[in-house]
Design a protein with these regions (language model features):
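Short, aromatic/basic amphipathic alpha-helical patches
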Residues: 54-64, 214
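Active-site/ligand-binding-proximal alpha/beta "capping" segment
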Residues: 181-228
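Boundary-proximal intrinsically disordered activation/regulatory segments immediately upstream
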Residues: 1-54, 140-141
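Glycine/small-residue-rich loop that forms an oxyanion/phosphate-binding "nest" at active or ligand-binding sites
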Residues: 67-92
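Structured adenosyl-cofactor binding patch, chiefly the S-adenosyl-L-methionine
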Residues: 86-89, 128-129, 143-157, 212-256
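RNA substrate-binding interface of SAM-dependent RNA methyltransferases
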Residues: 38, 95, 100-186
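Short beta->alpha connector loops at strand-helix junctions that form conserved
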Residues: 70-71, 111, 137-138, 160, ...
Length: 257
């Protein structure tokens, strides 16, 4: 049986200030925990049902000192999602390490993306399209929010995020790199040519788009052509469309299924 202190500690990590205080966060569900166990994240503990440990006996035996057996009832009482029926991990957060676009590399920039589900989805999309770095404004939602982690489906283990003041960051680091921003009124994405030298792609806030302070650094405004009557696209969907068009301009890079 889990101790009261253990239950209190895990539950506290659902709140941002306690994640920051303890420098820890929670990861729920078999897929995400399995990816976590194969990553470079430092894991404090894994609370798992007996069934999970038996099903994945090889990997659980490799990390047996981390595992603590719990019942399904205990697990569902701790987690944020009732669909979690296998495991939950407590993990140390990483340092907020500086990131920038290297030669021929594209980096995503998120300007005040506020919805955790959207951020998690964008991380997953970035992973799919081979984007390894995301630079976030200080007001972008916390990457360690349980909803972000869940929506990323394990991709948080492969995509690095850096939080910073975007205006200062771009002023110092953009240099002669292309900085493309997603806007409602810009050059058609279908006609835009992403340079092989790489650069930055900015996605804005769900309601307000790219802020004025960040817009100053945009060298190319691009838009996804609209054919129907919808007012706008979800920022996650828009990110996928833009990255897909970017990769379409490259030949022989994608991994076939």
């Amino acid at each position: 049986m889990l101790s009261k202190n253990r239950i209190k500690y895990v539950n506290s990590l659902k709140i941002k200030k306690y994640r920051q205080l303890n420098q820890s966060f929670i990861v729920e569900g078999a897929k995400s925990v399995l990816e976590l166990l194969n990553s470079d994240f430092e894991i404090e503990l894994v609370l798992a049902t007996q069934e999970f440990q038996q099903k994945y006996s090889s990997i659980s035996s490799q990390h047996k000192t981390l595992f603590e057996t719990v019942t399904l009832t205990e697990l569902q009482g701790l987690g944020s999602f009732q669909t979690n029926d296998s495991c939950l991990a407590v993990v140390k957060t990483k340092e907020n390490v500086f990131l920038r676009a290297e030669d021929s590399e594209y980096v995503l920039i998120l300007d005040d993306v506020s919805d955790p589900g959207n951020l998690g989805t964008i991380i997953r999309i970035a992973d799919w399209y081979g984007i390894k770095k995301i630079v976030c404004s200080e007001n972008t939602t916390d990457v360690y929010n349980p909803k972000v982690i869940a929506a990323s489906k394990g991709s948080f283990t492969r995509v690095a995020l850096f939080y910073t003041d975007l205006a200062k960051y771009l002023g110092t680091n953009a240099g002669d790199k292309m900085v493309a921003g997603a806007f409602l009124g810009g050059e058609s994405l279908y006609n835009f040519k992403f340079p092989i030298e790489g650069g930055y792609i900015i996605m804005g806030n769900e309601s307000n788009g790219v802020g004025q302070e960040v817009e100053k650094f945009v060298t190319h405004k691009i838009t996804i052509p609209r054919f129907g009557e919808a007012e706008s696209l979800n920022v996650g969907i828009a990110t996928a469309v833009i990255l897909d068009n970017m990769r379409r301009g490259e030949k022989g890079i994608g991994k076939g299924e």
